[in-house]
Amino acid sequence: MTAESGDQIPTVHVATSLPKRGVSSSVLIVPVVSTGDDEQSGERPGAVVASAEPFLSADAIAEIEAGLRALDATGASDQVHRLVVSSLPVSSVLTVGLGKPRYEWTPDAVRRAAGAAARALGTAKTVVTTLADLPGDGVCAAAIEGLILGSYRFSAFRSAKTAPKDAGLHKVTVLTTAKDARKHCAHGAAVATAVATARDLVNTPPSHLYPAELARRAKVLGESVGLEVQVLDEKALQKAGYGGLVGVGQGSSRPPRLVRLTHRGSRLAKNPRRAKKVALVGKGVTFDTGGISIKPAASMHYMTSDMGGAAAVIATVALAAQLELPIDVIATVPIAENMPSATAQRPGDVLTQYGGTTVEVLNTDAEGRLILADAIVRACEDNPDYLIETSTLTGAQTVALGARIPGVMGSDEFRDRVAAISQQVGENGWPMPLPDELKDDLKSTVADLANVSGQRFAGMLVAGVFLREFVADAVDWAHIDVAGPAYNTGSAWGYTPKGATGVPTRTMFAVLEDIAANG
């Protein structure tokens, strides 16, 4: 799986010993942990190597720890130091802190440390690391994910004046004695590459990624991994009655699209008849001005990320095909550009959604739920066992949960399952309720529903309640609002860069894996 406009993804290799040749220009990444406790023992805080044996000699470890003492290193989480170690055949050693020692490490602790190390590599092209040999389930794949995601960069639109002078990280070699290390590292690399694909799509500016172009890229990616692909243009959408998608897109000179990507994985299952079917839906607003209900200018440029849900869904279904998950996965991706013009929908207009429900548009900036409603109804026609929808849907998500925590709504049991898995993979989704009384706030005087309520509170939940009206009764579903988490407007941290994050790609794929394993 590759993205068309992204930078190179490093290759991954596994070794059981430190190579003696060909690593003279490599950086060796070594995890360290904190020692000492000023308050309790009076011992000076310090750092010791956490994972190096049997790959490094006792002399090399002692030299690293002596260098750390000279730098007053504490081993705090994400703390990095660069050392020259004469007894090793590499150009330098980069230590990264894990915090206090543990008997086992969580995957996300390793993933974050690997990401912090990757961001500190500078112009290094090749790295070797012992991070993957830390004790704990899933750390091998996590180390690879962190290194690839932490080294991610997007320079497709930089000229020679500002483009990076180096080629970026080219090769990663992990040192580990773990069983099935190659399989786990390959899995981690595939997941990280899918996240990078989603990031590339979101980071591509709307001048270059409009509805027809996003549909084209989805088609190219889908066909490259064997997906069935269907693309509906504006004429087909009008004819089939996709009123929400047509209504949102009618203000733009670049008309809407609907993309369907299908992975027939049930044929790979031991019992194909019992294999589950999962629908994915992702909001694809390639740019959102707000329409006639126009947004403030100050932060409008961030709306290049308003197709973050679509990007994650496209990357996820492609990954399901690449890794041959034994379940059916069908992605439905509505794509539009929300622009003000003489042809744009107006506040007060009534749309007929796909399936027949009428909606009064009280605010044209609540457009995401309109295109999602069409897509959800279409997705439910496939009779899925589960439906996962994700979108950069409401600013209220960031008010309630901040910029890093997605809100997860939907059927109670499945919502909790999705949120728990999201927390396990480090994307930290949080379960939220959908109170029945909020539906009363969506009453319209002229249509079946209004697209917004007249209240200031619970905006994230109101949007979820609106979407629930379009989900078939027999379908377990989850709605993941990633308005903040899909795009990092602050500084880079861990394995998360400034700009597109790829959230919630890892959550959705982990849920698919869980369904494939457990139904």
Swiss-Prot record:
InterPro entries: Leucine_aapep/pepB, Macro_dom-like, Peptidase_M17_C, Peptidase_M17_leu_NH2_pept, Peptidase_M17_N. One of its GO terms (molecular function) is metalloaminopeptidase activity. Disulfide bonds: none annotated. One of its GO terms (cellular component) is cytoplasm. Mn(2+) 1 binds at D288, D365, E367. Binds 2 manganese ions per subunit. Keywords: Aminopeptidase, Cytoplasm, Hydrolase, Manganese, Metal-binding, Protease. It is an enzyme of class 3 (hydrolase). The active site is at K295, R369. PROSITE patterns: CYTOSOL_AP. Mn(2+) 2 binds at K283, D288, D306, E367. Its cofactor is Mn(2+). Pfam families: Peptidase_M17, Peptidase_M17_N. GO terms for biological process: proteolysis. It catalyses: Release of an N-terminal amino acid, Xaa-|-Yaa-, in which Xaa is preferably Leu, but may be other amino acids including Pro although not Arg or Lys, and Yaa may be Pro. Amino acid amides and methyl esters are also readily hydrolyzed, but rates on arylamides are exceedingly low; Release of an N-terminal amino acid, preferentially leucine, but not glutamic or aspartic acids. It is found in: Cytoplasm. Its EC number is 3.4.11.1, 3.4.11.10. HAMAP family: Cytosol_peptidase_M17 (MF_00181). Belongs to the peptidase M17 family. Presumably involved in the processing and regular turnover of intracellular proteins. Catalyzes the removal of unsubstituted N-terminal amino acids from various peptides. This is Probable cytosol aminopeptidase. It comes from Mycobacterium marinum (strain ATCC BAA-535 / M).
